[in-house]
Amino acid sequence: NAIAEVREAVDFLHYYAGQVRDDFDNETHRPLGPVVWISPWNFPLAIFTGQIAAALAAGNSVLAKPAEQTPLIAAQGVAILLEA
């Protein structure tokens, strides 16, 4: 259901924010560089958001391609992330 999907996306964001706070040291951690994520059609917001959050938390730039069945969900997710 949609509420569970949004909750899972928020959980991913909280998790990776905690990882940055607890485990990354800018003096020793170096980003890998640009990463590409292709998300599946199931869990279109949660998995898409989790992939982006993981890459950004590690300092990488992201090129994310949503599933062809769910482009509007991904577009709205990106808009919300940019607003945040």
Feature map (PLM): residue ranges:
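Rossmann-like NAD(P) dinucleotide-binding subdomain of oxidoreductase/dehydrogenase enzymes
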Residues: 3, 7, 12-84
